[in-house]
Curated annotation (Swiss-Prot):
SUPFAM superfamilies: Xylose isomerase-like (SSF51658). It catalyses: alpha-D-xylose = alpha-D-xylulofuranose. Mg(2+) 2 binds at E268, H271, D307, D309. It is found in: Cytoplasm. Binds 2 magnesium ions per subunit. The lineage of its organism: Bacteria, Pseudomonadati, Pseudomonadota, Gammaproteobacteria, Pasteurellales. InterPro entries: Xyl_isomerase-like_sf, Xylose_isom_bac, Xylose_isomerase. Mg(2+) 1 binds at E232, E268, D296, D339. HAMAP family: Xylose_isom_A. It comes from Actinobacillus pleuropneumoniae serotype 5b (strain L20). The active site is at H101, D104. Keywords: Carbohydrate metabolism, Cytoplasm, Isomerase, Magnesium, Metal-binding, Xylose metabolism. The gene is xylA. Its main location: cytoplasm. This is Xylose isomerase.
Length: 439
């Protein structure tokens, strides 16, 4: 195994009083909460792209990070070195899963033939590394947005040859995900949107992406992939407007093309921020629509209008997120993938550990606080009482379709209905939640 991170043996749980920066203060993977271990609840994953592929570049500057595997003249050899170091990191951090795009793990090459050769070579290596370490693949995906061929979209591109290239990448990436035991396959339409309506046929592009997703579902069943298909919503960036704007928009799209039973959502915190929603809102919406699948854990900056992909650090925010997840029954095939990157000035390789350790502890503490909310049932009891009238005769008749507008007008008149406003108790409920978080 690689020894790139030679200062660390393995990150372990030492408890809240520990001052060791390379120890977990709250994440005890074997601690049982609501009948499952923390590890089973959280299903943590490290992302390949931000962690091992990013150079530290931004819109105004070149890469600032010193990564040995990015300096090799032979790109495939660099990819092999990167895989060794990645699995060293996974093992020493002690997380069970990782995630990747196809071109994260292998150089794209200059032709389709080179792409396939490089990708298959690296899949062979990842398969061996998984067997050696026990680390598993949470999900795989294809990068159909970085190459200039995708500047006008992938499945929504005006050129069917570009559509075909995207299909070829998804074909290879899904096959690899199945081979590696991946539990999900993600589709993020990085450039599935538009810059201007002046050169865009919205109806045609919607039909194209709808057919593409149908083809993805068809291939899943053809190869016997038993994992979950996931779409990741995002409102904009890099395009001005993306078609998978938010969870509700994705659900409408799935319904239009008959895919609502086939595809769920992978929700990213920062994407919720960009869409003008809270992270909690997006998860609650997905659960209500029965399309909740997985999470990309990170945070955005409300003062900035772009995807900052910072590590989550708010127990207040994530307690409510965990509460929604627990109410929905928890993850099945999904989990918490850290789609987060260290800052451009964080040039020490061990900053990767600090970012992940802190984020994992935030999720662990949030899980414990949310579990208390579930166990006590106080909050849910207040919500149940608020809607109790719908369990009575009138409410049930309305929901069962046994009352028309005319029927209800007659009831209001005959019974002289005069309902009085009832307090929503928002301030009390906010105090109640804070009591769980801070006690």
């Amino acid at each position: 195994m690689s020894n790139y991170f030679d200062k660390i043996e393995k990150v372990k749980y030492e408890g809240a009083d520990s001052t060791n920066p390379f120890a977990f203060k709250h994440y005890n993977p074997n601690e049982v909460i609501l009948g499952k271990t923390m590890a089973e609840h959280l299903r943590l994953a490290v992302c390949y792209w931000h962690t091992f592929c990013w150079t530290g570049n931004d819109m105004f500057g070149v890469g600032s990070l010193d990564r040995s595997w990015q300096k090799t003249g032979d790109l495939l050899e660099g990819a092999k070195q990167k895989a060794e170091i990645a699995f060293e990191f996974f093992q020493k951090l002690g997380i069970p899963y990782y995630c990747f795009h196809d071109v994260d793990i292998a150089p794209e090459g200059n032709s389709y033939k080179e792409y396939v050769h490089n990708f298959h070579t690296m899949v062979d290596i990842l398969e061996k590394k998984q067997a050696e370490t026990g680390v598993k693949l949470l999900w795989g995906t294809a990068n159909c947005f970085t190459n200039p061929r995708y500047m006008s979209g992938a499945s929504t591109n005006p050129n069917p040859e570009v559509f075909s290239w995207a299909a070829s990448q998804v074909f290879n990436a899904m096959n690899a995900t199945k081979r590696l035991g991946g539990e999900n396959y993600v589709l993020w339409g990085g450039r599935e949107g538009y810059e201007t309506l002046l050169n865009t046929d919205l109806k045609r592009e919607r039909e194209q992406i709808g057919r593409f997703m149908q083809m993805v579902v068809e291939h899943k069943h053809k190869i016997g992939f038993n994992g979950t298909l996931l779409i990741e919503p995002k409102p904009q960036e890099p395009t001005k407007h993306q078609y998978d704007y938010d969870v509700a928009t994705v659900y409408g799209f799935l319904k239009q093309f008959g895919l609502e039973k086939e595809i769920k959502v992978n929700i990213e915190a920062n994407h919720a921020t960009l869409a003008g929603h809270t992270f909690q809102h997006e998860i609650a919406t997905a659960a209500a629509l029965d399309i909740f699948g997985s999470i990309d854990a990170n945070r955005g900056d409300p003062q900035l209008g772009w995807d900052t992909d910072q590590f989550p650090n708010s127990v207040e925010e994530n307690t409510l997120v965990m509460y929604e997840i627990l109410k929905a029954g928890g993850f099945t095939t999904g989990g918490f993938n850290f789609d987060a990157k260290i800052r451009r000035q964080s040039t020490d390789p061990y900053d990767l550990f600090h970012g992940h350790i802190g984020a994992i502890d935030v999720l662990a503490l949030s899980l414990k606080r949310a579990a208390k909310m579930i166990e006590d049932k106080t909050l849910q009891g207040i919500v149940d009482q608020r809607y109790a009238g719908w369990n009575g005769d009138l409410g049930q008749q309305i929901l069962a379709g046994k009352a028309s507008l005319e029927d209800l007008a007659k009831i209001v008149e005959s019974k002289a209905l005069d309902p009085k406003p009832v307090s929503g108790q928002q301030e009390y409920l906010e105090n109640l939640v804070n009591n769980y978080i801070y006690r």
